[in-house]
Curated annotation (Swiss-Prot):
Superkingdom of the source species: Eukaryota
Pfam families in alphabetical order: EFR3_ARM
GO biological process: bulk synaptic vesicle endocytosis; chemical synaptic transmission; phototransduction; protein localization to plasma membrane; synaptic vesicle endocytosis; synaptic vesicle exocytosis
Membrane topology: Single-pass membrane protein
PANTHER family found in the cross-reference section: PROTEIN EFR3 HOMOLOG CMP44E (PTHR12444:SF8)
Cellular component, GO, one term: plasma membrane
Disulfide bonds: none
Coiled-coil intervals, chain numbering: none
Transmembrane segments: 595-612
Organism: Drosophila melanogaster (Fruit fly)
Extent of the HEAT repeats: 120-156
Name assigned to this protein: Protein EFR3 homolog cmp44E
Amino acid sequence: MALIRCCFEPPELPEFFDSFVQKCTDPSCCCGCCSALRPRYKRLVDNIFPVNPEDGLVKSNMEKLTFYSLSSPDKLDRIGEYLYQKATKDINRKRYKLAEIAMEAMDLLLQACHAQTTLNLFVESFLRMVQKLLEDSNPNLKIMATNSFVKFANINEDTPSYHRRYDFFISKFSSMCHSDAASMRDSLRLAGIKGLQGVIRKTVSDDLVENIWEAEHMEKIVPSLLFNMQFCVNVMFVKKNLLASGDLTPVEDATNVTPPALAEEVLRELVGRASFGHIRSVLKPLLTHLDRHELWVPNTFAIHTFRIVMISIQPQYSYTVVETLMQHLDNNFKSSPKTRTSLAVVLSKIIAIAAGESVGPSALDIINNLLTHLRTSVSTTSEITPEESQYQEALINALGEFANHHPDYQKIEIMLFIMNTVPDLSKKSKGDQMLQNILLKSLLKVGTQYSTVSFEKAFPASFLQPLLKMARAPHNPTRMVVMQILQALLDRHQNEQVLSSVSVKPYPALSQEPPSRSDIIFTHKYGANIMQALIDSMALSDRVDALTSSFNTAALLIVEMSCNETVQEFLLFILGIQQVACTVDTLGNVHKCSLHAISIGLLVLISRVSGINNLLEYAQKIVDARREEASHFLPPLLEPKKLAGKTFNLQLPHLAIDKLALGECLQNAGMDAQRLNTGAPYSLNQTDHPGHRHSWVESVSNQLTQRNSSADLTVYNGDVDSVSSSPGVCKKLLAPEFNFDAMKRALAEPTEAAKREQRERQMQIVRTFREGEFDDLMRRTEPKHDLIQNRLNELFNSLAVERQITQSDTKSSQLQASNEKPIYETNFPELFYY
């Protein structure tokens, strides 16, 4: 084989002139010795290379080549092919300066001729040259090739080539992101990140171009970006406001950009360009990278990364990130508690961002997933370890953060949804109690985020009734969480800390305003149920923290709902607490003392918030008397463990709160005391009937004044007389009139309840006469005799007056009838004549 050969072989000599005119593209051709024999584009290309490679590109000749390319765009592809051949030859011969000149020339041609229709053929040669430079081991060539590719990525092609492939560039740029070269590590990594950004911009804008969202590509791009981000000294101080728009700059010019900051910028751009169907393609390799490199513990980098994702993603797709992270938490249910806790913390940090875009079923779906994880955590562990407890707290915080960014009406729906998932009290196993406690803590987390305006909206019946049932739970922590939930929803004026301890002292920092009409109606309907649940809760435990929590709830209820229409019911509630302390034999002495202290503390509180001075004076007299004779009946509450063997004098009836005295205080203040005088104090374990105590809304005195017929006076009611003359026993109400409300109450009240009430009344009468002292019985009975006598005198006087009025009306009507003319003799006026 000849070392030098001519393009004109002997058999082709007759065609010499035709062959001479044709273009010669063989690099080993000898006709280059005569420039006149070479095509013009080759001569122009050759002229841009200097004699000394160190001198760089010949600018004047480059301008001629550019002008020729613009004038003859059909030659552009051949120019590119020839430059590629020359660069390949120079790279193989290690003449890197000449290869750099060739690459620079192609960059200039690309920038000048990017509007030409024949650019696609030139781009193929351009990309082949970039690939050739990237394949070489010289780092400068790699950086230069990357810069050239970045310039190409900034060009918007009118007719992109859909058969063009970028697999090699993705792989090569990803490998450059992991470079460990000692001298140029940061430069190579920056070049690799810039190259990936160029690929992203070139491909994601057109769906017909190569699908970069495929798993094989994302598994290279995303880990490469995360690898550079995690090498920052402190990722929390990485520049967060880098913009992903605008033309890319060469790596050499970006001297103030670090690989972590640039990688974060590219990740933002990648996530921001992802559509709904491509979000998971980015998240899956992200989660895999965090798992393989064990970056969940500590979770600083994971939180930072997911915040970038949530901020950069399109808002309507943010729910997908939360859903994917929850699925990953499902897949890691066998991982260590620390890993799951870190995952839950990451979830709590980002879930608030997604909450604003999650409405309707998606919001409850997230809540349901979080509750499912809580139930799984409780069911899979027999003993709650500190790590598992931290995991549960992280899930609860995530739930609270999610609910905090929803409107109040959705918070009510979330609380109702959680309440429906709490196990019933009939399930008394340890696991069910743990689950009850955990779910109620979740409910408390949501409740603390809710701003109560109207109690009717904050306590719908479907939510309040099961909550009050949980207030009677035998498990102390469960009851205390329920009390905290009630406190969070009742406290509209931030009085919870002011009323956090039982006291008889003034509350100067107490904030109060009169309740609205809707709140009063709510108290009429459900106040009795709430107070009954509080009494039952107080009787279940003698622990100071449990009793203090119940006192706090009762105090908030009084402060928020106290007014002239509700004060009598609250006084019956206080008397009920005292009655439980006096009559329930199963309670310990310390427990009874604590209940007496709570009752006097609530009495002082209601007398202050209601502004009834007579009531306050009476309460202060009891406090002073107890301070002298029985300090154990006053706050602070006694510790059962410290005073287990100590005995207390509990038979001190003269230091108890007297119902008649309370009624006199109200009457002296000009208020109606009928409900207090005739109603029975709350008792222990009384069944909740919303209509049972509804009669206290109406004034019984109105009913009595309407019963003024003679027939009512002839009817003897033995129960009324016996009960009225019995001390400490409430008087049985007269039969109500048959109006709509009375019929509704009669239908709602079961027959068994009336029988049970009758038996309790009889037992109470017998107990009073057996155990009470004679002087006490006389003292309590005498005022009632006077009251009955006065009432009878009023009735007889009213009957006498009515009889006189009736007789006078009869005489006047007869006289008028005799003077009137018959109707047939009446003459019509002329106005009605036709």
